[in-house]
Amino acid sequence: DEIGCGYVLVENGKIAEVGKGMPQHVRKSDIDAEGKLLMPGFIDIHTHMGFIGDGAGEEGIDVNEGSDPVMPQLRAVDGLNFMDGYFADAVSAVVTSVVTGVGSLNPVGGDMVALKTAARCLDEALIGTVGIKFALGETPKSYYTERDDAPQTRMATAALIREALEKARRYMVITERAEEPED
């Protein structure tokens, strides 16, 4: 809804309150935004920021690990370069948060993490692990065909993903049983 005359209260960098009229307390740091459009920051839910390396050359590219098509053990934080210039670009474009991680080379590629873009270090930026990357498209098929390795078809790609998910399910069952108290 549009608020013609109103205010937005920001506390600790987050929107704490939105209201009509004037706020109860006016501060020196208040900004008069009359006639302006006010929006919260954007969230980019699919990026490889921090893995491609803004100007870092081949050494700065950690987006794909091509040694095995199934790599669920890859952790995004281990390859992420938080000093990548794309984070500063994101901040200047009002992108406040991103989900970033490995590329689409592998059918099972590793985890994805959510980050705040305006932070001084990775520990401060890290919101948490939010998922795992799966790729069913042409990228794994063409890469592994070129290497004369599996998967070379979408069928084989899907089969590898199913196998990895089944292994994960069995692992969960085993660990849940191990946590059950003995009688």
Regions found by a protein language model. Name each.
Residues 2-39:
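Histidine-rich, glycine-flanked metal-binding segment
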Residues 2-3, 80-83, 154:
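Solvent-exposed, acidic/flexible segments
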Residues 24, 31, 59, 145-148:
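Intrinsically disordered, low-complexity coil segments
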Residues 86, 91-183:
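Polyanionic/metal-chelating signatures
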